[in-house]
């Protein structure tokens, strides 16, 4: 076991990515739930490759080296990352746009990849597994399953531990946070076989995440007792920008506009959020974020900033635009 990773865990600095668990050749490591999010649990038989430290976001991923490997050069702008094109817009499909966290672009793109046989499955974060207030990585293998995983999730979800369960004969897309995308690229750089099954990385812009304890703290502020269990939780329900919706066993339903529950951030913000230097998913093929602009907020409906970072993804987005699957406007950057 890496002493550096042991120190990361001891100091409470784990980024919850799950990369180390996927690299354990013994197969005995797994992620456990804690009030500070998922963290790895290792066994005495755990064995890891020499590059494990390089892939750990909490130890620190060498972005300049990774840029030279993946993009073959350094970015012109370190705030924005490598870019093919920047656009704003949304899915042309009203139902997908409405169900998405912003403009439904990620969902629409995943459906396109699946229906056109670019992928056999999409690895997504899904709220409600194994219990309503928790979330897990999930492999969607149908359009309905992809749509069912729409929406944002603001608690840590380990996305890379599932790599060890992938079928080497299949192709996948994955949605993951910036630090997870970078870690995945390190795994690919080191020819880790399961990581090579990931053909497309589609990542959201990421500002802050909060620890799971924030949910119960919020409910206490609404006079909800701890024994009143959660039966459903949606972070961005309803029309964009959405509202937090929590349904309880008692039958009570609590809805709070997104901007109103942001007060939880200073008290429950994750260490990963505080440490992160990447908010725009620099190693995703496609990076998508909310278009937080008074212009778009007044229009309603949900709008996204859509950034293509690789030529293969630019080609896909252009095809989707030509087929009227996406309504996108090119922006100057």
Model-inferred region functions:
Residues 1-4, 19-41, 150-153, 240-258:
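Short, charged low-complexity linear segments at domain edges
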Residues 6, 48, 101-105:
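Short, glycine/acidic-rich beta->alpha junctions
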Residues 8-11:
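Long, charge-dense tracts
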Residues 13-41, 49-71:
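Iron-sulfur cluster-binding cysteine motifs and their immediate structural context
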Residues 63-333:
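Iron-sulfur-associated redox domains of electron-transfer enzymes in respiratory
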């Amino acid at each position: 076991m890496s002493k550096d990773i042991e120190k990361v865990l001891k100091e409470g600095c784990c980024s919850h990515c799950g990369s180390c668990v996927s690299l354990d050749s013994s197969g005995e490591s797994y992620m456990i739930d804690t009030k500070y999010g998922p963290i790895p649990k290792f066994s005495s038989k755990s064995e890891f490759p020499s590059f494990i430290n390089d892939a750990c976001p909490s130890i620190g991923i060498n972005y300049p080296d990774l840029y030279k490997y993946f993009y073959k050069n350094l970015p012109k702008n370190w705030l924005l990352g490598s870019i093919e094109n920047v656009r704003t817009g949304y899915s042309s499909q009203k139902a997908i746009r409405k169900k998405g966290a912003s403009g439904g672009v990620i969902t629409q793109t995943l459906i396109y990849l699946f229906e056109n046989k670019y992928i056999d499955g999409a690895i997504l974060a899904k709220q409600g597994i194994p219990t309503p207030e928790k979330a897990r990585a999930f492999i969607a293998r149908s359009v309905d399953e992809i749509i069912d995983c729409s929406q944002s999730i603001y608690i840590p979800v380990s996305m890379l531990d599932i790599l060890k369960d992938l079928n080497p004969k299949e192709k996948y897309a994955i949605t993951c946070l910036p630090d997870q995308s970078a870690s995945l690229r390190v795994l690919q750089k080191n020819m880790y076989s399961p990581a090579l099954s990931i053909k497309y990385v589609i990542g959201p812009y990421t500002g802050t995440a909060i620890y799971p304890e924030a949910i119960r703290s919020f409910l206490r502020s609404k006079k909800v007792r701890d024994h009143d269990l959660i039966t459903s939780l949606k972070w961005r329900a309803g029309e964009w920008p959405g509202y937090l919706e929590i349904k309880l066993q008692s039958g009570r339903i609590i809805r709070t506009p997104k901007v109103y529950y942001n007060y939880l951030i200073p008290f429950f913000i994750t260490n990963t959020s505080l440490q992160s230097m990447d908010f725009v998913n620099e190693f995703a093929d496609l990076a998508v974020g909310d278009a937080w602009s008074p212009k778009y907020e007044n229009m309603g409906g949900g709008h996204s900033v859509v950034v293509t970072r690789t030529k293969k993804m630019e080609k896909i987005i252009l095809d989707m635009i030509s087929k009227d699957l996406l309504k996108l406007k090119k922006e100057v950057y």
